[in-house]
Amino acid sequence: MKIALIAHDRKKQDMIQLTTAYKDILKKHELFATGTTGLKITEATGLPVVRFQSGPLGGDQQIGALIAKNDIDLVIFLRDPLTAQPHEPDVSALIRLSDVYAIPLATNMGTAEILIRSVEEGAFEFRNIVHGRDRDA
């Protein structure tokens, strides 16, 4: 699966903890992230991450473009709900696109853990259908 990882500044440490805790699951998948988040994940875990611009510089939009092409299967976006974000319209657009294309989306640690564990259990087989992959092939 192709998994997007995004975290606002005050949630980056949470993302590090999440990716460290679930490194063995995440290493089996393609990871994508906004700039600083991706760098911090790689530094902390050694996981390879395709990095885009930082969120305020267009990284959220770059990931949104992949969602619009159905090239992302799951999004973990640890948002800071208590701090105004200068790129809030980009954040809203990314969440909207996830809904439009039925991309599983977590915006907090509890849901992120459930989604990652579900990935390991094969709970997102519908994404294989979206991509035209036959799991028995």
Swiss-Prot record:
Domain spans labelled MGS-like: 1-137
Catalytic activity: dihydroxyacetone phosphate = methylglyoxal + phosphate
Family under the similarity heading: Belongs to the methylglyoxal synthase family.
Descriptive protein name: Methylglyoxal synthase
Record GO biological process: methylglyoxal biosynthetic process
Catalytic residues in the record: D60
UniProt keyword Lyase present: yes
Enzyme Commission number(s): 4.2.3.3
Entry annotated with the keyword Lyase: yes
GO CC term, one of those recorded: cytosol
NCBIfam families per record: MGSA, PRK05234.1
Protein residues bound to substrate: H8, K12, T34, G35, T36, T37, S54, G55, H87
Organism: Bacillus licheniformis (strain ATCC 14580 / DSM 13 / JCM 2505 / CCUG 7422 / NBRC 12200 / NCIMB 9375 / NCTC 10341 / NRRL NRS-1264 / Gibson 46)
Single GO MF descriptor: methylglyoxal synthase activity
Keywords linked to the UniProt accession: Lyase
Role of this protein: Catalyzes the formation of methylglyoxal from dihydroxyacetone phosphate.
